[in-house]
């Protein structure tokens, strides 16, 4: 249900902003005196007087003038948002977004009838395809053009690709309203409605077209990089025949796929759209914070799509180093780096759901991990009822596994080794698994020698010729405990020390925290054991 205030504003159309007998430079505002409906009115004489006094040093700091100035700011923002909404309803979000992007009109100025005409003409030009014309690669010299409207005349001037500061807030406001409208529609979608109504959904103001238009606004605002990276990850997820970013267009590969897709395939596609819609609520929440005065986010956790065992508020996932599958699906795993070089993949214990376990297995197979190191003790696995996915034979979605135990004699039976065969379609891969059965949570291993021995075992695991270190997220060891921060960070740091005992452990910890989250290597006793291992290695190399 719409709030009462929103319902009152719904009666305002573009014609509401045209006032006969009023100067074209008179400030407009939304009034609601003596009526249950809002209406557009010219600024009152008393308000003009207070505005004039606010320009005089003697009066501008008085309480009445300062209060008036704040009221004017709120009024200006409200009427601009309402006007842009009226424009959007008539010309569509894409035309309004493009016009705001390309226009150099100052959106911080009070809304007047002159400004109403200028913005409307700019949107009409965008709606008529003028934006596309000046963006066309054949139009040399106007690739980075801006529309400048003066007295109704339109000309083209050079500018960079970033939207002007005065247009950022209106763009975000339109995107916020668009997301609030489209997300519930996407959540209500099912396979039948997708097949029957796709053309409507992917055109005009349909939810899929509208969604892509609103999300496109973010890459025009440099400060919104984290938000843009987040939505880019979501748009790059493969659904059916193409990436989700292509689902806002009719007549292409997506529409042809929908026509031929089975009921099961459509159900799976809708399932992905539902989880993406849920993730987009995080973007809406960030927009709300920005609207309330917060700065653009400087960091963001990556989308988890329901695959993570823990909430990102507990175990953060750096979106810049988040691992993604070949179909674009992000998994709750990060690439740990030290000194700019990948060390290992790190994550929490896989969530005990079919989708999460399938994604985890696909990652092991696609990334051809040199080994899988499970650091969760046997006691903890039983106490928390964690799935022993790495031993036995299972089918997780499209992935089939068959794991055979190789040995358990090493280090007094503390480490079990398995060879786990993975298959998915035509792809096959066998990965060695090391299960450390006696490493308590938040504590070090029983001995420093066992930590060094384990590091050697991980480094020497080299299945199918995969290198132990890589320049990408392939052919790296995959390490996890329960949360993927303490024991996992300790194991990865031990690998760094085996490569170079002179490595600065404080810097290793800092780099791991930058590449995954600020909880990496958080347990003091485990860090002390790393220092002891480093001392042993340095003594050995010196002798």
UniProtKB/Swiss-Prot annotation:
Keyword Secreted set for record: yes
Catalytic activity: O-phospho-L-tyrosyl-[protein] + H2O = L-tyrosyl-[protein] + phosphate
Keywords, in A-Z order: GTPase activation, Host cytoplasm, Hydrolase, Protein phosphatase, Secreted, Virulence
PROSITE patterns: BACT_RHOGAP, TYR_PHOSPHATASE_1, TYR_PHOSPHATASE_2, TYR_PHOSPHATASE_PTP
GO cellular component annotations of the record: extracellular space; host cell cytoplasm
UniProt-listed Enzyme Commission number(s): 3.1.3.48
Bacterial Rho-GAP domain sequence ranges: 162-293
Record-marked site positions (Arginine finger): 209
Region (Chaperone-binding) location: 35-139
Record: active site: 481 (phosphocysteine intermediate)
Domain Tyrosine-protein phosphatase: start-end pairs: 315-543
Enzyme class: hydrolase
Compartment list: Secreted; Host cytoplasm
Molecular function terms from GO: GTPase activator activity; protein tyrosine phosphatase activity
Gene3D superfamilies assigned: non globular Virulence effector SptP domain (4.10.1330.10), Protein tyrosine phosphatase superfamily (3.90.190.10), Virulence factor YopE uncharacterised domain (1.20.120.260)
Protein task: Effector proteins function to alter host cell physiology and promote bacterial survival in host tissues. This protein includes tyrosine phosphatase and GTPase activating protein (GAP) activities. After bacterial internalization, GAP mediates the reversal of the cytoskeletal changes induced by SopE. This function is independent of its tyrosine phosphatase activity, which remains unclear.
Note: Requires SicP as a chaperone for its stability and secretion.
Binding partners and assembly: Forms a complex with SicP.
Name of the protein: Secreted effector protein SptP
Species assigned in the record: Salmonella paratyphi A (strain ATCC 9150 / SARB42)
The encoding gene: sptP
